């Protein structure tokens, strides 16, 4: 199941460096889609500019999008979608990147996930593409209502799937010598 997440993490370099700032750095969540959002990327590459900066130990709020960027962010979801305009042109949007002050290539960063807030809706689709299209007869789309405990859908009455929200990708950008 694909989910919209609002992720709050705390990042620090694994050295004795401390932040005096308590202000939360907010990354992503602007623009109609990832292409219009300066806090959204869809690949990991050293030429991507570091738009956001944070001190070691400072909290960062990532306003993330679903895997194909059709539902918007948690804050923009207002009503359950009846259909989805699925376009695989700009898949896998990620919030970021964030420069951690004092970090240099090769440093190990410690990330503590403080909270994951699921969006109101998620979806599952299959058939006609994806990972195992030859094992699925026909196409389907199921929209799920999400909360912290479970997901449920009118398409599969009586079924509740336990919510196991996760952040997706947490990574550092590669250096030019790592391409």
Language-model-derived ranges and their functions:
Residues 62, 108-111:
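A generic structural signal for residues embedded in beta-strands
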Residues 67-79, 116-127:
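Short, Lys/Arg- and Gly-enriched loop/turn segments at beta-strand edges
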Residues 10-19:
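Hydrophobic h-region of N-terminal signal peptides that target proteins for export
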Residues 35-45, 87-95:
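Short, structured beta-strand/loop micro-motifs enriched in basic residues and often containing a Trp
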Residues 115-179:
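Intrinsically disordered, low-complexity linker/loop segments enriched in Gly/Pro
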Residues 2-10:
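Sec-dependent signal peptide recognition
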């Amino acid at each position: 199941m694909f989910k919209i997440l609002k992720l709050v993490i705390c990042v620090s370099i694994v050295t004795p460096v401390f932040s005096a700032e308590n202000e939360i750095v907010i990354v992503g969540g602007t623009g109609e889609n990832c292409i219009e959002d300066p806090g959204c990327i869809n690949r990991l590459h050293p030429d991507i500019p570091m738009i956001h900066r944070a001190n070691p130990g400072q909290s960062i709020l990532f306003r993330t999008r679903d895997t194909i960027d059709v539902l918007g962010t948690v804050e923009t979801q207002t009503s359950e979608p009846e259909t989805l305009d699925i376009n695989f042109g700009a898949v896998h949007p990620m919030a970021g990147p964030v420069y951690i002050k004092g970090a240099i290539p090769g440093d190990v960063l410690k990330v503590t996930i403080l909270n994951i807030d699921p969006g109101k809706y998620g979806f599952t689709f299959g058939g006609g593409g994806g990972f195992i299209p030859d094992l699925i007869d026909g196409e389907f789309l199921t929209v799920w209502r999400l909360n912290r405990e479970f997901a449920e859908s009118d398409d599969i009455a009586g079924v509740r799937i336990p919510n196991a929200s996760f952040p997706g990708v947490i990574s550092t950008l590669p250096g030019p010598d790592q391409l």
